[in-house]
Amino acid sequence: MTVLGYPRSWSCHCLPVLILLLGIGHGPWVEGVTHYKPGDPVILYVNKVGPYHNPQETYHYYQLPVCCPEKIRHKSLSLGEVLDGDRMAESLYEIRFRENVEKRILCHMQLSSAQVEQLRQAIEELYYFEFVVDDLPIRGFVGYMEESGFLPHSHKIGLWTHLDFHLEFHGDRIIFANVSVRDVKPHSLDGLRSDELLGLTHTYSVRWSETSVEHRSDRRRGDDGGFFPRTLEIHWLSIINSMVLVFLLVGFVAVILMRVLRNDLARYNLDEETSSGGSSDDFDQGDNGWKIIHTDVFRFPPYRGLLCAVLGVGAQFLALGTGIIVMALLGMFNVHRHGAINSAAILLYALTCCISGYVSSHFYRQIGGERWVWNIILTSSLFSVPFFLTWSVVNSVHWANGSTQALPATTILLLLTVWLLVGFPLTVIGGIFGKNNASPFDAPCRTKNIAREIPPQPWYKSTVIHMTVGGFLPFSAISVELYYIFATVWGREQYTLYGILFFVFAILLSVGACISIALTYFQLSGEDYRWWWRSVLSVGSTGLFIFLYSVFYYARRSNMSGAVQTVEFFGYSLLTGYVFFLMLGTISFFSSLKFIRYIYVNLKMD
């Protein structure tokens, strides 16, 4: 019995995956090791095909007219593998451990003109295939295309009908797997009449060799045999240059701001001592700057429930991002494992929902919020609802085009169950703890009942200018690394420099905090006490710059095309920018709050 075309064993696999997501059992990043004896069968699974320049546009391998068993048996997949678009199925290839095969016939085929045209179109779009041997992905192109720009113009398309598998072993374990088409001529697909059948004979060979490498992670050539480009190792100099510029920027802002602030505190405290005989109101009338608004600076903002929800979800994603990077640094992710990061991200997201509930409810109660149930609902839906809407559009496009990236109904129900049984309850539990542990808001100054009138502000202190400056500077700190991240997620790179990623992430947060403090100081100096939302928007606008960069990357740095890839790219890029807005907006707000409390605590007042 099958479910949506996949075996029931896959549906039964959902229960252990759910248990896995609850933190029971081994994580998805644990690398399995299979031990073989000479002559033992080694199963080769066919997985997916798709355009080389559209990594997220993938289809089942057997959707092409290729050698296929009479009954297709699918491999049970983990949740992360399903989310990665994997659809592994058994193949006709017969491989035995340490037994070479010179040339063996896989199958004979008679292709119709429609099937030939399907293959021609796939080859013209640079379709690649992915097989999996002992959890090692091996990739190659479906065919060969040669086009001449000289006269006479030629356009030749050929299909690779022979594959040469090269496998390396150490002891009783497989270390490396690769496929090539060396010394093989492609079978021409040109010149076929519409009523003519094309006869093909698919063959393959297997070569085994022993290696001294004991672990797959030590195999520097990687799991793809150079099929995907590797250029990540060359960006050290750019990263170091970026770090130097960022440290100079942070140091400059910190030194200048501290000097100005120290002078302000000394002047204000001196003026306070000389006018100690008068009232505070009399003193305010003779002063200007950030001190004069001390009775309004802690006035609670409008839409406080939404503000607290932003802070809660932002804190959750800060914990989630830190957790993913730390797990990568500890070696829990392996390039050979399918969907490991996907599974870990879902697990961490579900578990960190308690953080969003706690932070949001705790601060909401501190600033006088009364509708804490509504606050919890808003917090739990602030990211999940935009994510669901984005995913619905993307998944519908994949489903309409028959892509393997479209999630089956069982997986959708599993993810919904995880959110309903783990994520949302943890948000509520965190909210209850946050509400009960909240103390009154600690404001160094009392707030008057009547709000002070805010004087007209110059154009360079407007929200738009603050968002431009506050968003561009943190973005410039990560722009170099952002290219490599995009090349990994939306291209064919493999990211392994997690140490650099950790430092860049720390630099991003540090720059965001420093810029937020500087912009908040300039805003308060203009007697504008509406800093609550401004601090979130100023540095949170980095997410907008990241989305604009994604548009630039799509247009100038990639060869992506087609509705499937385009919808997925812009949908999830917009969601990524939103996540960065939440994270950096949270860092910016709490940095500004800490700074404001510091300067007003150190200010002598009646």
Curated annotation (Swiss-Prot):
Alphabetical keyword list: Autophagy, Cytoplasmic vesicle, Glycoprotein, Lysosome, Membrane, Signal, Transmembrane, Transmembrane helix
A Gene Ontology cellular-component term: lysosomal membrane
Entry's localization field: Lysosome membrane; Cytoplasmic vesicle, Autophagosome membrane
Residues bearing glycans: 178, 401, 559
Keyword Signal: yes
Spans traversing the lipid bilayer: 237-257, 310-330, 339-359, 373-393, 412-432, 469-489, 499-519, 535-555, 570-590
Domain of life of the native organism: Eukaryota
Topology relative to the membrane: Multi-pass membrane protein
Family annotation (InterPro entries): EMP70
Signal sequence range: 1-27
One GO process term, biological-process aspect: autophagy
Family according to the record: Belongs to the nonaspanin (TM9SF) (TC 9.A.2) family.
Function: Plays an essential role in autophagy.
Protein name: Transmembrane 9 superfamily member 1
Organism (species): Mus musculus (Mouse)
Gene name of the encoded protein: Tm9sf1
